[in-house]
């Protein structure tokens, strides 16, 4: 079974770069406090790194 990480949105996407908003949508995050569980892959890690100032990651 693949490793998973929990990603929680901690800051609003209002006023952010369109690319960063699209990244949040790609991760499946919709609102502040929303948490999703995703596979720990290089692609997901790259998306998390791009919006690291808006999300919290738990291993």
Curated annotation (Swiss-Prot):
GO-annotated molecular function: structural constituent of ribosome
Subunit structure: Part of the 50S ribosomal subunit.
Protein name from the UniProt record: Large ribosomal subunit protein uL30
Coiled coil: none
Upper lineage: Bacteria, Pseudomonadati, Pseudomonadota, Gammaproteobacteria, Enterobacterales
Keywords on record: Ribonucleoprotein, Ribosomal protein
SUPFAM superfamilies: Ribosomal protein L30p/L7e (SSF55129)
Domain of life: Bacteria
InterPro entries attached to this UniProt entry: Ribo_uL30_ferredoxin-like_sf, Ribosomal_uL30_bac-type, Ribosomal_uL30_CS, Ribosomal_uL30_ferredoxin-like
Family membership: Belongs to the universal ribosomal protein uL30 family.
NCBIfam families in the cross-refs: rpmD_bact
């Amino acid at each position: 079974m693949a490793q998973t990480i929990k990603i929680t949105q901690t800051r609003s996407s209002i006023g952010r770069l369109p690319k960063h908003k699209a990244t949040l949508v790609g991760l499946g995050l919709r609102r502040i406090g929303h948490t999703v569980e995703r596979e720990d892959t290089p692609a997901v890690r790259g998306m998390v790194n791009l919006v690291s100032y808006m999300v919290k990651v738990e291993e």
